């Protein structure tokens, strides 16, 4: 789950040494117990924000605990895959309503308007749950082995996990009895718990929900004020239109008026709801125009402002807490090295620490040539001594991507051939700008070919076959490009670049796909028609986006886009989890109601708008339906239709609560965050241009100006820039 902050091998660290460190190397180093190794472990903990608790590092069994911890982290990918599998199980699990004694079996998918994903049988579902439960138990309880029970149970998060695990086990036992036909099971809590475990064990998601929990009080206050506005406006509308056509046809009661005015607050039924009044008198439009202006452009934006202000306050607390934890951890590392309590470190001590940091998987490889640069970076006072405040900048300094010499390609094993005049000339050509211009030209020609081939495909023109062959030819040109780059730079250096990784995967899939297309029998439609390879070739056109980075007016927009994607992932993931909760609830409340045999279905707006496929009969359809409601596309159709099908007004509570949480709260939060983050990124881009225009000699002395940041560093840097004034106030209040 972790990755290097700095890719590549250092120039003096040995050409043949593996760039990627081994967990066993770190475990063995820490197990042998020097102060510098413990300090390096603490710095690593400060860098990634996770790892061994500080209390363990002071214990007598630190080495054993660290060894068990590293064994645990070796399976990070497996743990992540298991939590993903827990969520995926919801999509394939057979809904409980299908187990009722139905007139028509759930196997008739058309009858119930079900999706296309297959259902797991009871036995298959139980096996799936059993395997994921076993891995879940191991992941939750294994930390006891290196933390100890007392320290483990002291954590509120661990206690919550254990309690939820016991509830999940009980739910599975009850489900087994249900499969044995002991009784009918109307409700399962497992679908909700799977998503909860997913949230609790994905740190970014967990932090997002903690922020939302801190905002809840402020949000409820502003929602209460909005509710007062809605109640008063609805009462005014009910009284005002009592004796008009509007009152006799639409605003027939206060409850009905309140419902219609609430939907109008979201503009989903505008202007349909006030057409009767408009027919009576054109002047009646003033009432509704004023209501929409106040509701949509004032109250809603007021909610947006309050939500984001509260969000920033909670985010500042979270970022400040992480900074304080980072500082406390670095202080421990500092004290371990400063055994004489001098209050400072000299260059030799820092050098020994950096040598230990070279063994860590989440920290960069630092060469001897870089030690002096980093030491100068930290030594703000210029006294050749590093105090605690200067040492606190260590994680930032060592996280920089210093320019390094490339590691040796494997072809250096044949120096006579690799360094021959022809080879040197070829490699020089590949490194040059001309080669990149040729590739860009090929991409542009490929784009034209794709457009022509796609147009002919739409027209069912036989000339499409020729252009498909042309596209296949382009695929092999990319193979040649990849081979030349690997030959020139070496595979390790080639793999460092994210674009190269994307090209490598797509290119090899194209090669394998083209081969399969030509050798596959005609009966295998998917392989033999070659259509799917075209979409991979189109995906390669995404490389053209990089051209926008060379256009000054677009650079800030493109850079902001790529920075905002990882910044927004936790909040988009939060919305996804909310959708999962509501989807599970929707299946249990509304599952099976929409079916061909329901006589009340034809009179609903679901049937009238041809929305029958958007239902809550299975998990995939439910998620798509909730997405449609999320984007506010005729969302009142589902609310009113399910109210009519269930026969109870309590149905409104489901849809209104979803609107309040997902649309009015979370989507507003994302909109505000994007606006603020974009402005911060534009400021950073402007600052970077100013730095680039400074004295080049000074820039070469401070090598950080030529570095780049990893994704997590960019997000962290962006957040600190966005919250710089609030963080300053927070640090002044809590010195």
From Swiss-Prot:
Q: Which residues lie on this side of the membrane: Cytoplasmic?
A: 1-67, 147-161, 203-208, 308-431, 492-503, 550-560, 676-735
Keyword set includes 4Fe-4S: no
**Which keywords has UniProt assigned to this entry?**
Calcium, Calcium channel, Calcium transport, Glycoprotein, Ion channel, Ion transport, Membrane, Plant defense, Repeat, Transmembrane, Transmembrane helix, Transport, Voltage-gated channel
Q: Which Pfam families match?
A: Ion_trans
Fetch the InterPro entries from UniProt.
EF-hand-dom_pair (IPR011992), EF_hand_dom (IPR002048), Ion_trans_dom (IPR005821), TPC1_plant (IPR044581), Volt_channel_dom_sf (IPR027359)
Show intramembrane residue spans: 249-263, 619-633
Q: Membrane side Extracellular: which residues?
A: 89-125, 183, 230-248, 264-286, 453-470, 525-531, 582-618, 634-654
Which positions does UniProt annotate with glycan attachment? 460
Report one GO cellular component: plant-type vacuole
Q: Name one GO molecular function term.
A: calcium ion binding
For this UniProt entry, what is the primary localization, expressed as one broad class?
A: membrane
Q: Which family does it belong to?
A: Belongs to the calcium channel alpha-1 subunit (TC 1.A.1.11) family. Two pore calcium channel subfamily.
- Assembly notes: Homodimer.
| Note in the entry | Rescues the Ca(2+) uptake activity in yeast mutant cch1.
Q: What is this protein called?
A: Two pore calcium channel protein 1A
């Amino acid at each position: 789950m972790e990755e290097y902050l700095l890719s590549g091998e250092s120039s003096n660290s040995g050409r043949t040494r593996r760039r990627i460190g081994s967990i066993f190397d770190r475990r063995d180093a820490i197990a042998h117990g020097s102060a510098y190794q413990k300090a390096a472990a603490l710095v690593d903990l400060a860098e990634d924000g996770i790892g061994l608790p500080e209390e363990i590092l002071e214990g007598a069994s630190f080495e054993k605990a660290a060894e068990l911890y590293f064994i645990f982290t070796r399976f990070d990918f497996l743990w992540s895959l298991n939590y993903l599998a827990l969520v995926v199980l919801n999509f394939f699990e057979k809904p409980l309503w299908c187990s009722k004694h139905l007139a028509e079996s759930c196997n008739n998918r058309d009858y119930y308007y079900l999706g296309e994903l297959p259902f797991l049988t009871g036995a298959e579902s139980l096996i799936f749950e059993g395997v994921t439960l076993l891995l879940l138990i191991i992941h939750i309880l294994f930390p006891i082995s290196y933390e100890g029970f007392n320290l483990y149970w002291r954590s509120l998060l661990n206690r919550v996990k254990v309690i939820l695990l016991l509830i999940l086990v009980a739910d599975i036992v009850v489900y087994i009895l249900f499969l044995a036909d002991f009784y009918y099971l109307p409700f399962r809590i497992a679908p909700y718990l799977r998503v909860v475990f997913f949230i609790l064990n994905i740190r970014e998601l967990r932090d997002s929900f903690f922020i939302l929990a801190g905002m809840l009080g402020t949000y409820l206050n502003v929602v209460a004020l909005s509710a007062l506005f809605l109640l008063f406006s609805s009462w005014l509308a009910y009284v005002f239109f009592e004796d008009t056509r509007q009152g006799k046809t639409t605003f027939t009661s206060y409850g009905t008026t309140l419902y219609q005015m609430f939907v109008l607050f979201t503009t989903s039924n505008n202007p349909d709801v006030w057409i009767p009044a408009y027919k009576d008198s054109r002047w009646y439009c003033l009432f509704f125009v004023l209501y929409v202006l106040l509701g949509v452009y004032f109250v809603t934006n007021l909610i947006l402002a309050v939500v984001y202000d509260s969000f920033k306050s909670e985010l500042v607390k979270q970022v400040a807490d992480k900074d304080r934890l980072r500082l406390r951890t670095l202080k421990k590392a500092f004290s371990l090295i400063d055994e004489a309590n001098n209050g400072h470190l000299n260059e030799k001590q820092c050098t020994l620490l950096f040598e230990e940091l070279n063994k860590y998987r989440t920290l960069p490889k630092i060469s001897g040539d870089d030690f002096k640069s980093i030491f100068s970076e930290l030594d703000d006072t210029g006294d050749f001594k590093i105090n605690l405040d200067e040492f606190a900048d260590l994680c930032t300094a060592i996280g920089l991507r210093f320019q390094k010499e490339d590691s040796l390609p494997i072809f250096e094993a044949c120096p006579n051939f690799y360094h021959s005049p022809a080879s040197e000339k070829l490699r020089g050509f590949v490194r040059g700008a001309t080669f990149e211009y040729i590739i860009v030209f090929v991409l542009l020609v490929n784009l034209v070919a794709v457009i022509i081939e796609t147009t002919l495909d739409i027209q069912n023109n036989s000339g499409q076959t020729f252009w498909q062959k042309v596209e296949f030819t382009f695929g092999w040109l990319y193979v040649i490009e990849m081979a030349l780059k690997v030959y020139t730079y070496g595979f390790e250096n080639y793999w460092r670049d994210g674009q190269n990784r994307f090209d490598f995967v797509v290119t090899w899939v194209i090669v394998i796909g083209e081969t399969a297309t030509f050798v596959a029998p005609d009966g295998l439609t998917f392989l033999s028609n070659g259509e799917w390879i075209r979409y991979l070739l189109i995906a390669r056109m995404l490389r053209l986006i990089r051209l926008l980075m060379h256009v000054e007016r677009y650079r800030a927009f493109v850079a902001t886009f790529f920075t905002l994607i990882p910044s927004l992932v936790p909040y988009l993931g939060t919305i996804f989890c909310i959708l999962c909760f509501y989807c599970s609830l929707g299946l249990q409340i509304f599952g099976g109601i929409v079916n061909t045999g329901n006589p009340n279905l034809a009179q609903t707006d679901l049937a009238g708008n041809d929305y029958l496929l958007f239902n809550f009969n299975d998990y995939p359809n439910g998620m798509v339906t909730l997405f449609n409601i999320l984007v506010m596309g005729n969302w009142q159709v589902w609310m009113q239709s399910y109210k009519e099908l269930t026969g109870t007004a309590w149905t409104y509570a489901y849809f209104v609560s979803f609107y309040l949480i997902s649309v009015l709260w979370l989507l507003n939060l994302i909109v505000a965050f994007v606006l603020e983050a974009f402005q911060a990124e534009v400021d950073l881009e402007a600052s970077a241009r100013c730095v680039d225009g400074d004295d080049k000699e000074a820039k070469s002395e401070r090598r950080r100006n030529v570095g780049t940041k990893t994704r997590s560093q960019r997000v962290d840097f962006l957040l600190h820039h966005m919250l710089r004034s609030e963080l300053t106030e927070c640090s002044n209040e809590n010195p």
